[in-house]
Amino acid sequence: MVSYSNNHFAYAFLLLLTIGNTLAFSSSLPDHVQDPNLVVDDVNRSVFNASRRSLAYLSCRTGNPIDDCWRCDPNWETNRQRLADCAIGFGKNAIGGRKGRIYVVTDPANDDPVNPRPGTLRYAVTQEEPLWIIFKRDMVIRLKKELIITSFKTIDGRGSSVHITDGPCLKIHYATNIIIHGINIHDCKPGSGGMIKDGPHHTGWWMQSDGDAVAIFGGKHVWIDHCSLSNCDDGLIDAIHGSTAITISNNHMTHHDKVMLLGHSDSYTQDKNMQVTIAFNHFGEGLVQRMPRCRHGYFHVVNNDYTHWEMYAIGGSASPTIYSQGNRFLAPNTRFNKEVTKHEDAPESKWRDWNWRSEGDMLLNGAYFRESGAEAPSTYARASSLSARPSSLVGSITTTAGTLSCRRGRRC
């Protein structure tokens, strides 16, 4: 008979072996995954394994595979970069500033868009080297113009209450390997055009910004996790112009109209390569539509909690593939807004061929998901015994969506 101590050793050994194999594999993956279903299965395996670990010694008992990867560690503050190993889905290879220096933001007030001062967030995100950016204390940052984030950067708000608000907000422009974690981003406004430093050795002229919380333009390997986003002039998260390899997870979104746009336009066919995973988010109070609104690409929407929408939750046009799995949809009380989905800008004779599938979703208060496309294409029904967590557990999985209160020496 195997003793408990041997079991403990076995769990630890298997966990380390799995992490090592995952890192070795992920380093060789291209931007665009040739078979998106492989990533869907990878998310399913991660969720299934987290569910099993929730019964074991090494787990924080959340069943959320991202959180179970790092939140159990009371020494998270001295091991911040472990977070980069915890992404899942299409954005799983976003390493941010891993292996770079820790850069501490100390100055929230003096935002100079052209000549950023050392100690400011703008100075940090425009450096050439990989950086893991953290914050010395709680702060409110009001940007004068859009913040252009360069490649291989992590913005990590854990341990501080960081708000970016009341001005232009964040932009990822043809950059790669970006992690944005633990930031409150709200009340973002359009920014005037003008000169903005957009790299270590370049300042360019930028057009007026739209007022998005996070705008991704041609970005790849992007992970947005545990942020709280609300009340911006345009979108909360918009990804367009060939952006791909994105995971949007564990966020809390509230009080906003057009929440998330994924795909530039029906005519911009380069977005056919777009691949986005939307997992473990809470779409909360005061939301209207676009959670997300998709075009062309491949979108895996898994284990999210939709507690509020006024028009619809998930929509799209230009034949996107949408796989909705294990979500909880609570329809509004208004009679004519019970439908989760909205097939946009096309007659039924066209959209009935778009591949939209609901699997294991919980539909409450009269909510209904209008499926379309083939009944059992390989997009949805690959032979696998692993699945997302049951929709009945979505409440517990997403209970800490949004920014976290993390303290030194304690589990986060």
Swiss-Prot record:
Q: Which GO terms describe its biological process?
A: pectin catabolic process; response to nematode
State the similarity comment.
Belongs to the polysaccharide lyase 1 family.
In which organism is this protein found?
Answer: Arabidopsis thaliana
Identify the EC number(s).
Answer: 4.2.2.2
Q: What InterPro entries has UniProt attached to this entry?
A: AmbAllergen (IPR018082), Pec_lyase (IPR002022), Pectin_lyas_fold (IPR012334), Pectin_lyase_fold/virulence (IPR011050), PEL (IPR045032)
- A Pfam family found in this protein is Pectate_lyase_4
Signal is among the record's keywords: yes
Catalytic reaction equation(s): Eliminative cleavage of (1->4)-alpha-D-galacturonan to give oligosaccharides with 4-deoxy-alpha-D-galact-4-enuronosyl groups at their non-reducing ends
Q: In which pathway does it act?
A: Glycan metabolism; pectin degradation; 2-dehydro-3-deoxy-D-gluconate from pectin: step 2/5
How does the cofactor attach, per the note?
Answer: Binds 1 Ca(2+) ion. Required for its activity.
Active site: which residues? R290
Cofactor (UniProt) = Ca(2+)
Give the enzyme class: lyase
Q: Under which name does UniProt file this protein? A: Putative pectate lyase 11
Which positions are annotated as binding Ca(2+)?
D210, D234, D238
Its organism's taxonomic lineage begins at: Eukaryota, Viridiplantae, Streptophyta, Embryophyta, Tracheophyta
List the record's Gene Ontology CC terms alphabetically. cytosol
A GO molecular function for this record? metal ion binding
Signal peptide interval: 1-24
Which keywords does this chain's UniProt record carry? Calcium, Lyase, Metal-binding, Signal
